[in-house]
């Protein structure tokens, strides 16, 4: 039976810390060594991760005046992601900055090039400040990915996806949950937000993976989830299906969540009929669309602010979906709620 990825088990924030000074590296190195040893990571890969971590911290301190953070994530496919996100001025010449010897602060200039060489995958997004009045985010996001298995299945599937899920104040219980399954040329997912937050919200969204195994349609999944959530706190949800064989997308949802479809440099924002699964809701809102060679679909809980579009993040939606999820989650997340983003892409 094909595995169903579960954000509660497969998408975990293992470390999160501000990088105000070079001393931030001490705690990060200690955490990295403990985690990689526990996971049985080879000595060579562990050393590569430590070197990348050092470069990321150094970049944040030198180029963003310490206005940044470093995160370590465990993600589906048995991978570890080192993420650097800062609120600096951005990189004026990204291509040049990745060439050894290039430096804007009179250093040896080996940072970005070394990060790309030492990691299994590396993705970089940057946005510059254009004026003093500019209100949108500026800075740089770097994702360095390390595969703990020899081979990545993502490259062969035709799909790429990224998950971001954090509980309120990074506490133990998270009412937001994402289930995702790949079946041949199909990608299906169920994205839920349990009412409120805490232990009861998490209980409402737990143990729902089987609904992706016994699949009929997005609407049918929501109906069965609705029945299962009776006598719980309840949840709002989105479910979707991407069919590569038919170049078809289907999305259905109930309640205060949003979907965003990016195609040919345009983004469509979708909201759903009000209601709560397990309690009371109106007819489910469904969307069906055909897509071309490049397509991105984003679903988000209400823990992610909605006042953004392509102009806020120019060029972001052509990046790897995991980098998109990290960027939106960290920058647009509300600190007063659980937060989750699911990003799926084709092409």
Regions found by a protein language model. Name each.
Residues 90, 194-201, 303-308:
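Short acidic, Gly/Ser-rich segments with clustered Asp/Glu that frequently serve as metal-coordination loops
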Residues 1-12, 57-154, 182-190, 219, ...:
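Conserved beta-strand-loop-beta-strand hairpin that lines the nucleotide-binding pocket
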Residues 156-175, 222-230, 257-288, 292, ...:
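PP2C/PPM family metal-dependent serine/threonine protein phosphatase catalytic domain
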Residues 200-266, 284, 333, 345-346:
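Catalytic core of PPM/PP2C metal-dependent serine/threonine phosphatase domains
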Residues 145-195, 200, 206-207, 280-282, ...:
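N-terminal entry segment of metal-dependent catalytic domains or homologous docking segments
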Residues 1-51, 155-181, 310-311:
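Bergerat-fold GHKL ATPase/HATPase_c domain
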């Amino acid at each position: 039976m094909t595995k169903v990825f579960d954000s509660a088990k497969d998408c975990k924030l293992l470390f999160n810390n501000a990088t105000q000074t070079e001393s931030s590296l001490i705690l990060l190195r200690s955490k990295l060594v403990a985690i990689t040893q526990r996971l049985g990571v080879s000595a060579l890969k562990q050393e590569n991760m430590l070197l990348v971590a050092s470069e990321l911290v150094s970049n944040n301190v030198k180029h963003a005046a310490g206005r940044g953070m470093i995160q370590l994530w465990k993600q589906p496919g048995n991978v570890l992601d080192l993420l650097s996100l800062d609120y600096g001025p951005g990189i004026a010449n990204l291509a040049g900055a990745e060439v050894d010897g290039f430096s804007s602060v009179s250093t040896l200039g080996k940072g970005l090039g070394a990060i790309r060489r030492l990691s299994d995958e590396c993705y970089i997004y940057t946005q510059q400040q254009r004026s003093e009045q500019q209100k949108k985010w500026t800075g740089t996001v770097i994702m360095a990915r390390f595969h703990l298995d020899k081979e990545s299945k993502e490259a062969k599937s035709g799909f790429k996806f990224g998950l971001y899920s954090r509980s309120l104040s990074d506490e133990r219980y998270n009412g937001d949950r994402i289930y995702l399954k790949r079946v041949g040329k199909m990608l299906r997912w169920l994205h839920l937000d349990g009412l409120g937050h805490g232990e009861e919200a998490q209980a409402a969204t737990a143990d729902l993976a089987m609904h992706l195994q016994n699949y009929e349609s997005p609407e049918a999944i929501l109906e069965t989830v609705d029945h299962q959530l009776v006598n719980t706190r309840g949840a709002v949800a989105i479910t979707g299906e991407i069919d590569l064989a038919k170049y078809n997308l289907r999305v259905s949802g109930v309640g205060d969540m949003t979907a965003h479809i990016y195609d040919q440099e345009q983004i469509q924002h979708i909201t759903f009929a009000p209601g709560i699964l397990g309690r009371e809701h109106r007819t489910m809102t469904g969307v069906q669309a055909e897509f071309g060679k490049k397509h991105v679909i984003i679903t988000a809980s209400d823990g992610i602010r909605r006042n953004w579009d392509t102009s806020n993040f120019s060029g972001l939606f052509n990046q790897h979906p995991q980098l998109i999820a990290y960027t939106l989650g960290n920058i647009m997340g509300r600190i007063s709620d659980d937060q989750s983003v699911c990003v799926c892409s084709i092409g």
